[in-house]
Amino acid sequence: MKKLLFVMLSFLVGTGAMAGEKDEYFTFNAGFLFNSTLNATLGYEHELTYGNAVELTAEIGNQWQCDPVCGKICKDVFWKGYYWDGGLLYKHCLKKFKNSNLRLRFGPEFGAYTGRYFFAVEGGLEYNYVFPSGVQFSLIQKNQVNFLHGDSFRNGLLIGLKIPF
């Protein structure tokens, strides 16, 4: 009996139990950004220690404008303001709750807007709720400052899912 207790105690002390560390997720987010912009993001997230994470993202969006001919949003000009970009985000955990966390996210992005290339810096907040299956619901407040073209600032809300693999 003493040997069994010693083995169990050694196992508990000798092994580390870190909840949520080194998890990997496929992420999908979609939402609206200011100034009349639709946005969709795909990504790969790798969790680090203490609730922090790194995410590699690919993003596509469209900034629509009114048609000068018909005076409203028409299908002929709706898809003219598209953009795409990709980036690397570091997500610092600000607060961990029982089944959720709040993170500060920031990092560089590179892409193109209607054929012109740009460099961007993204920052914002991310709230994640973890379901019992391991799937996460995320609510993201995004701020993006773009350089080298006219669409210089985007901010808004995105909602999405993170699926573990």
Please describe what each predicted stretch is.
Residues 28-41, 80-82, 110-121, 145-154:
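Solvent-exposed loop/turn segments connecting transmembrane beta-strands
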Residues 19-23, 50-51, 94-102, 115, ...:
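Short loop/turn motifs that connect adjacent beta-strands in outer-membrane beta-barrel proteins
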Residues 46, 90-94, 127-129, 145-147, ...:
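Residue-level signature of outer-membrane beta-barrel architecture
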Residues 28-32, 56-62, 88, 104-112, ...:
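Transmembrane beta-barrel strands of outer-membrane/channel proteins
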Residues 19-66, 162-164:
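Short glycine/proline- and aromatic-enriched beta-strand/turn motifs that initiate or cap beta-hairpins
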Residues 86, 152-165:
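Outer-membrane beta-barrel "beta-signal"
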Residues 1-23, 165:
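Cleavable N-terminal export/targeting peptides
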Residues 54-82, 112, 119, 139:
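Flexible, solvent-exposed loop segments that connect beta-strands
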